[in-house]
């Protein structure tokens, strides 16, 4: 297991233990390990092909599925999934920059009521600028030389997303 795997599938990214009878909300979908019935995709639609850059296509389809099946999407106890991450931490961080730059606003345009829930308020807010800036990024990268703690990775991932969103198009 890599440091990136520990971040992606650990508690600091928001890993939740979900009861079998609890409906999944759109934030709980991780499409690299998800099985969706064909009739649900036929009804909600497939991935948005206008999202040609990295990221957000899974979030966008999750929103559509959650809107149509708010009580119907459940965890399948018998399904087993194994996921091997092929990326480095730096590659993933670069992917999140690309997501913020190219696809985040496409999701917001299609689903404006979700913008605050998706982190829009952090992009140009005072609190976002105070927390995510050149100095804090430098400090975090310096600390990463000592430890690849998942919270440091999380900070750099969010920072990359915000920088990408500020540099859209």
Language-model-derived ranges and their functions:
Residues 98-99, 116-169:
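Non-catalytic, C-terminal membrane-associated alpha-helical segments of glycosyltransferases
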Residues 53-61:
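Acidic donor-binding loop at a coil-to-helix junction in glycosyltransferase catalytic cores
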Residues 1-6, 70-72:
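Conserved donor NDP-sugar-binding/catalytic core segment of glycosyltransferases
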Residues 39-43, 80:
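Short, well-ordered alpha-helical scaffold segment located
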């Amino acid at each position: 297991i890599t440091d990136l795997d520990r971040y992606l599938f650990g508690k600091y990214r928001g890993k939740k233990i979900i009861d079998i009878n609890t409906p999944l909300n759109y934030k709980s979908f991780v499409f690299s390990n998800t099985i969706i019935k064909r009739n649900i995709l036929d009804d909600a639609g497939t991935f948005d092909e206008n999202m040609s850059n990295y990221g957000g296509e899974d979030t966008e389809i999750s929103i559509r599925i959650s809107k149509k099946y708010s009580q119907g999407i459940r965890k399948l106890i018998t399904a087993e999934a194994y996921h091997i991450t092929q990326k480095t931490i730096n590659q993933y961080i670069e992917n999140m920059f690309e997501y913020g730059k190219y696809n985040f606003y496409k999701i917001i345009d299609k689903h404006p009521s979700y913008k605050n829930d998706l982190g829009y308020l952090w992009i140009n807010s005072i609190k976002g600028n105070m927390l995510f800036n050149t100095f804090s990024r430098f400090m975090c990268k310096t600390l990463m030389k000592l430890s690849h703690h998942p919270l440091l990775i999380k900070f750099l991932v969010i920072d990359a997303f915000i920088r990408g969103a500020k540099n859209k198009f």
